[in-house]
């Protein structure tokens, strides 16, 4: 629930960009297009703004596990979801940033267990002991195969009378208080509408005169096949901004 607009992020960004092993890279010819977004981001890198974002992120995330439980009631998840927690580790080089995150989560009432090197080794004995400390969230869960879970949810949605249409939506507006979607040849009226198009959502929200500062972020991952047994749960290396998750038949590095 700690947002990216931390007060210390601006001092970290230059080092992230300079380092070839850093977690951040920019496509330089895209920078001019990013300037309006970046200006708004910098303006929000203040403690009161950070805490505002963290507070409302926490309210959403705090409801996520019960919400998933409700969705999962009608589908068979055997072997697809594991309840083994999530582990964050770090070195003393980034201790100031980690202390800030711990403090914020404490203020929000997040349950967290600080762990020392011995406790980290007990949890994940195959990790090279480069770490100086960490935090463990024992109630967290992870998916072994997100695609299989989504397919099961989709099939249940169709079974319960849901409809799936693949259309090019041209516009979104309102008929009174009811949202309306318009494709090239059809018009749909709904009681409620969720716009969930990822980076392309802005094309539709702009038509509603909602100026959302949404931009794109490209992420990469690597599969290490046959290595899912090396760790028992997701492990995040906070210094470098990447994580590893044991999944079906492979270890995923993000």
Where are these regions (language model features)?
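Alpha-helix N-cap/helix-start capping motif
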Residues: 117-118, 147, 198-199
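Short, flexible turn/loop "capping" segments at secondary-structure junctions
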Residues: 80-81, 128-130, 245-247
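Dinucleotide-binding Rossmann-like beta1-alpha1 core, especially the glycine-rich loop
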Residues: 2-117
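Conserved beta-strand segments of alpha/beta enzyme cores
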Residues: 111-113, 163, 211
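Active-site substrate-recognition segment that forms the wall
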Residues: 5-43, 171-174, 178, 187-252
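Residue-level signal for well-ordered alpha-helical positions
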Residues: 101, 126-127, 207-208
């Amino acid at each position: 629930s700690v947002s990216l607009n931390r007060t210390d992020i601006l001092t970290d960004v230059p080092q992230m960009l300079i380092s070839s092993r850093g977690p951040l890279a920019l496509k330089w010819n895209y920078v001019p297009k990013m300037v309006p977004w970046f200006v708004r981001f910098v303006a929000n890198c203040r403690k009161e703004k950070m805490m505002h974002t963290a507070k409302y992120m926490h309210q959403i995330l705090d409801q996520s596990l019960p919400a998933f439980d409700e969705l999962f009631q009608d589908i068979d998840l055997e072997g697809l979801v594991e309840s083994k927690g999530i582990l964050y580790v770090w070195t003393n080089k980034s201790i100031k940033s980690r202390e800030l995150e711990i403090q914020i989560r404490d203020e929000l009432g997040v349950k967290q267990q600080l762990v020392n090197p011995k406790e980290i080794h007990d949890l994940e004995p195959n990790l090279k002991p480069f770490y100086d400390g960490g935090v463990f969230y024992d109630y967290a869960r992870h998916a072994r195969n997100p695609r299989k879970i989504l397919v099961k949810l989709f099939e249940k949605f169709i079974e319960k009378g849901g409809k799936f249409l693949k259309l090019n939506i041209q516009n979104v507006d309102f008929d009174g208080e009811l949202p309306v979607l318009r494709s090239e040849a059809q018009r749909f009226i709904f009681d409620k509408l969720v716009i969930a198009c990822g980076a392309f959502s802005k094309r539709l929200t702009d038509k509603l005169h909602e100026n959302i500062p949404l931009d794109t972020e490209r992420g990469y991952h690597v599969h290490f096949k046959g290595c899912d047994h090396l760790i028992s749960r997701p492990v995040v290396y906070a210094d470098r901004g990447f994580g590893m998750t044991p999944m079906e038949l492979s270890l995923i590095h993000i």
